[in-house]
Design a protein with these regions (language model features):
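Selective transmembrane helix interface/packing segments
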Residues: 1-247
Length: 247
């Protein structure tokens, strides 16, 4: 049994100093597939919108938008509408990246780089609003409170926001992948122990691998994935709201 990270599929030799060659990994491949599917879904849901006699497709699209609006408003307030697309994009991409493993593709959220990229985007927005609200000098002065000796700790506290968000999401998704893999391997070993003494093809029966891994995959890929997407987006809205000086 082996547990490996995302494989490098292609390497584009650019010879760019410092950056080096551009590597296309399973993470990039799966992420592009998810983005393409989400774009196609958004295009399909947004076509031929009407004010009257709406179709079931339009009703579903309106329901999604209304729930997303309500989520952002409940966590941030009605004057933060401009963050609805950001939160919606992160939520949809997170769920899509989690669920793509159901069809056998590599889950981008099992790669820390994915969550780190989302967390960095959120961190930049948080820093922008902190500086916009308090001013650059007041923000830098705040890093010295209550005494200048606390500056390193305050800086670490700021940096810990994106780090904790990324590792929380990544750790939960990766743990689900590891548990599912270990369970599948254990069931294969159990099948071999029980049926291995039988003659012919009967010794190769993998009866215990039927059904049980599907239920664990259903939990970790569907339920657990949706929960982690919800938590990440909730933290995003709360941190941005606090950075803007809202309580």
């Amino acid at each position: 049994m082996e547990l490996n990270g995302a494989k490098i599929l292609y390497t584009i030799h650019t010879n760019i100093p410092v950056l080096g060659d551009f590597k296309i990994t399973q993470t990039l491949e799966s992420t592009w597939i998810v983005m393409a599917l989400l774009s196609a879904l958004a295009f399909w849901l947004g076509r031929d919108l009407k004010l009257e006699n709406v179709s079931k497709r339009q009703a579903a699209a309106e329901f999604i938008v209304e729930r997303l609006d309500q989520f952002v408003h409940d966590n941030m307030g009605w004057h933060f509408d401009k963050f609805i697309p950001l939160v919606g994009a992160i939520f949809a991409l997170s769920i899509g990246c989690n669920l793509i493993s159901v069809v056998g593709l590599w889950s981008p959220t099992a790669d820390l780089n994915t969550e780190a990229a989302w967390a960095i985007v959120v961190f930049i927005i948080i820093m922008y609003y902190k500086i916009k609200t308090n001013g650059i000098l007041a923000y830098l002065k705040g890093l010295l409170d209550p005494i200048f000796l606390m500056a390193p700790i305050n800086v670490l506290s700021e940096v810990s926001t994106p780090v904790s968000m990324a590792f929380r999401h990544f750790g939960n998704i990766l743990s689900g992948t590891v548990i599912s893999t270990l369970l599948y391997w254990a069931l294969a070993s159990l099948s071999h122990v029980i049926f291995g003494w039988l003659p012919g093809f009967l010794s190769q029966l993998q009866l215990f691998q039927i059904g049980i891994p599907a239920f664990t995959g259903l939990y970790f890929d569907w339920f657990g994935g949706c929960i982690q997407a919800f938590i990440f987006c909730t933290l995003t809205t709360i941190f941005i709201k606090r950075a803007a000086g809202e309580e």
